[in-house]
Design a protein with these regions (language model features):
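Peripheral terminal and linker regions in Fe-S/redox and tRNA-modifying enzymes
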Residues: 1-334
Length: 334
């Protein structure tokens, strides 16, 4: 959470790991906003949800209640691993290499275990990309896993925007997805050993290359940390792949905000509100529309856009109608 400029007002950031917001979490946000009269809700570029203008009592109660609904607020600000990001249409996007969402969620759980471990960067962003579109911008974050056509990942590290921006360094290719946590820890450990925490403006992994003496020396440090970690720990993850089994209703739909999924007959609807700040009544209208739809969930993207996925054509039409008044349609409004 963060203190706001106004006296006695705070913002609480809710992790939506990999941008996944199932219907029960959407309902929690709607119910909480009504209960505490929350005036501003914001979808962030890190695919999280921010609740603004909270009093101290509401802040503490919401943090505790969120945990009961599978929503983690710990480490969402400050010197911590931030919300793990992912291509928002992973698993349903036409042309994707493979569904990276399960790996992003596993990485998000693992990243939480790194809190308070050693000297840490001011932010640590773990990102997954599922297709050549690279919708999550995995190539310029602290560590990015970019899907390949062979079902493996290329790994980029020490990228970032802000002052002195830089693209990530391609640290390894054809990495087995079960090994992603080794790389997340190795990059974290590299910063712990070589990062600059004395200067807050430079306490980011994108400065590691120069601190290590150049790209090649930096790579050597990361590779050595990888080798050491593999000797000491077993960080292998085991994912049971799941597939969308829902089928279409025999009809089709087209439109500017309609995205045909790779599952025949199913669609996603894009919903971008002004500034990525939906009103409470707009969120409630969306929830009431989709609450009984099978296998439907909301995905948040890095442009503060929401996507409602796994809709039949008739369901998609209802979601379009429910979001018509609140959705922006021009590039300028985006």
């Amino acid at each position: 959470c963060y203190a706001q400029r106004e006296d006695d007002k705070c913002m609480l950031r809710l992790r939506m790991t990999a941008g996944s917001m199932p219907k029960d979490k959407l309902k929690f946000i709607v119910d909480s906003a009504k209960k505490y009269h929350i005036s501003k809700i914001h979808f962030t570029t890190c695919q999280a949800v921010q609740l603004h203008n909270l009093g101290y009592k509401a802040l503490t109660e919401l943090a505790e209640a969120g945990y009961d609904h599978g929503i983690i607020t710990r480490g969402t600000g400050g010197d911590n691993p931030r919300n793990t990001m992912c291509s928002p249409l992973s698993g349903v996007e036409k042309g994707e290499y493979f569904d990276v969402m399960p790996y992003a969620k596993a990485a998000g759980e693992y990243a939480l275990t790194l809190i308070h471990q050693g000297k840490i960067p001011r932010k640590y962003k773990v990102v997954f990309s599922n297709s050549p579109k690279n919708a999550s911008h995995a190539t310029f974050h602290d560590i990015g896993f970019v899907a390949r056509s062979d079902g493996k990942f290329d790994v980029y590290t020490s990228g970032g925007l802000g002052p002195n921006p830089r693209m990530g360094v391609l640290i390894d290719t054809a990495v087995d997805p079960k090994d992603i946590c080794y790389y997340i820890y190795a990059q974290w450990k590299t910063f712990s050993e070589h990062g600059n925490c004395q200067n807050r403006g430079r306490a980011r992994t994108r400065y590691l290359i120069e601190l290590c003496g150049g790209e090649e020396e930096y790579k050597k440090v990361v590779y050595q940390n990888l080798a050491d970690i593999r000797k000491r720990e077993d960080l292998t993850i085991h994912i049971q792949p799941s597939a969308v089994t829902k089928t279409g209703d025999g009809t089709t739909i087209e439109g500017d905000r309609v995205i045909a999924q790779k599952q025949e007959g199913l669609y996603a609807i894009e919903w971008h509100t002004v500034g990525g700040c939906p009103q409470v009544d707009e969120l409630e209208k969306l929830y009431e529309t989709i609450k009984d739809f099978e296998d439907v969930e909301v995905r948040l993207g890095s442009y503060e856009t929401a996507y409602i996925i796994n809709l039949t054509a008739s369901e998609a039409k209802k979601v379009l109608e429910a979001t018509e008044d609140s959705a922006v349609v021009s590039e300028f409004e985006h």
